[in-house]
C-alpha cells in the first residue's frame, strides 16, 4: 500500500417530488439504477444484480469505452421504501481502491421524499477517492432527480 489510509464520511441529501415507493424502486431495480447512477461522463454495467438482504451486485464503471473499475455490493439491510444499508468494495484490476458502508434513508415529506445518503469510506489510494465518491454520488442524485422528473 503506497498511500496512507484515508477515512471520510460523506452525507448528501435531496428532496424529490416523488413518493418514497417510487424513489426506492429506482434503487431496487438494477436496470433503472444503471440508467441514472453513473455520473454524466461515465458508464455503469451490472454483471450481477441481487437486490435482497444478503444479495450481491457486481458492476463495472468508468469512461464509456473503459469500464476498468469493478465494484461489489453486499446488501445488509433492506426495509422497503425506508432504508437500505450496503457495503461496496471498489477495485481497479487487482488493486483495492476503497471500501464503503452506505446508508440510504428514504423519509416521506409533504413534497415527496427526502433521501439522505451517508457514505462512510476508507480509501486505500488517498483523498482523491473520497472526492470521487462525493462527486459521483452527487452526480447520481442529480441524475435521479432528472429521471424522476424533478427535485426540490
Where are these regions (language model features)?
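Hydrophobic ligand-binding cavity/cleft-lining segments
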Residues: 1-43
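Intrinsic-disorder/low-complexity, polar/charged segments enriched in Ser/Thr/Lys/Arg/Asp/Glu/Gln
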Residues: 7-13, 20, 44, 56, ...
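Short beta-edge strand/loop motif at the mouth of beta-sheet-based domains
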Residues: 11-12, 31-68
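Hydrophobic/aromatic beta-strand elements that line small-molecule binding cavities or substrate pockets
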Residues: 12-14, 46-49, 71-77, 100-108
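A short, structured loop/turn motif at beta-sheet edges
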Residues: 20-21, 50-52, 76-83, 105-114
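Hydrophobic pocket/interface hotspot
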Residues: 23, 33, 57, 75, ...
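Helix-adjacent hinge/juxtasegments
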Residues: 58-80, 84-86
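Beta-strand/loop substructures that line and gate deep hydrophobic ligand-binding cavities in soluble
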Residues: 85-87, 91-138
Amino acid at each position: 500500500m503506497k498511500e496512507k489510509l484515508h477515512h471520510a464520511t460523506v452525507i448528501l441529501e435531496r428532496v424529490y417530488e416523488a413518493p418514497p415507493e417510487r424513489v426506492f424502486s429506482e434503487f431496487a431495480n438494477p436496470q433503472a439504477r444503471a440508467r441514472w447512477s453513473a455520473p454524466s461522463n461515465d458508464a455503469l454495467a451490472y454483471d450481477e444484480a441481487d437486490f435482497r438482504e444478503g444479495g450481491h451486485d457486481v458492476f463495472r464503471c468508468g469512461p464509456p469505452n473503459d469500464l476498468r473499475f469493478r465494484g461489489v455490493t453486499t446488501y445488509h439491510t433492506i426495509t422497503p421504501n425506508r432504508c437500505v444499508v450496503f457495503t461496496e468494495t471498489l477495485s481497479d484490476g487487482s488493486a483495492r481502491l476503497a471500501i464503503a458502508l452506505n446508508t440510504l434513508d428514504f423519509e416521506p415529506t409533504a413534497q415527496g421524499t427526502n433521501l439522505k445518503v451517508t457514505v462512510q469510506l476508507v480509501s486505500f489510494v488517498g483523498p482523491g477517492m473520497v472526492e470521487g465518491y462525493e462527486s459521483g454520488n452527487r452526480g447520481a442524485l442529480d441524475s435521479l432527480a432528472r429521471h424522476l422528473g424533478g427535485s426540490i
